[in-house]
Design a protein with these regions (language model features):
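PP2C/PPM-type serine/threonine phosphatase catalytic domain
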Residues: 1-181
Length: 181
């Protein structure tokens, strides 16, 4: 979208602007179309990053040993249930609860859902990875961490992830960007 290419900085206001832009650009022809969103703005000198998300697209900090730490909080029914019932696990709930509870929609309304925003510091040897749920729904955290330990560069790691996901019977869209420090 044109708006993203013109932004100098991201903040919570970015989501409200994107909702308006999405509705203006797509509302007439694609009314009700929806998307999740994740973005990062990184200051390469201070290694500080602003992380912004809506829905179940995620940001991860990956350490030098290949351990993945989820930065963002999913805006899904399941995530809300897990917050309300801390003694339960994902497997304890029906898969229908994985639905997104917050997203950007081309429907001419103002954005009124949940926004995740956090500022983090990235250390030398760490990587920041942004992805759609096609990556995390298709590969468990254990599989992703094993891939990170087994391969020594991000291109190989992400290629293996893509191939494993493509082999599965179902396939969701898969978008990934990684920045290593």
């Amino acid at each position: 979208m044109q708006l993203l290419s013109q932004m100098e900085s991201i903040s919570r206001q970015t989501i409200y602007d994107l909702q308006s832009s999405l509705s203006a650009e797509l509302g007439e022809d694609y009314f009700g179309s929806a998307t999740t969103f994740v973005a990062a703005e990184i200051d390469q000198i201070t290694r500080k990053a602003k992380i912004l998300s809506v829905g179940d697209s995620r940001a991860y900090l990956i350490d030098a040993q290949g351990k993945w730490q989820q930065i963002t909080q999913d805006h899904s029914i399941l995530s809300e249930l897990l917050t309300d019932f801390p003694d339960k696990k994902e497997e304890d709930f029906a898969t229908i609860y994985g639905g997104v509870s917050s997203c950007l929609v081309a429907d001419y309304s103002e954005f009124q859902d949940k926004i995740f925003y956090q500022e983090i510091e990235i250390k030398q040897g760490e990587s920041l990875l942004l992805c759609s749920d096609g990556l995390t729904d298709g590969l468990s955290s254990e599989v992703r961490e094993n891939i990170w330990k087994q391969y020594d560069n991000d291109k190989s790691r992400l290629t293996v992830c893509r191939k494993l996901i493509t082999k599965q019977g179902f396939y969701d869209d898969l978008s990934v960007i990684i920045c290593a420090f």
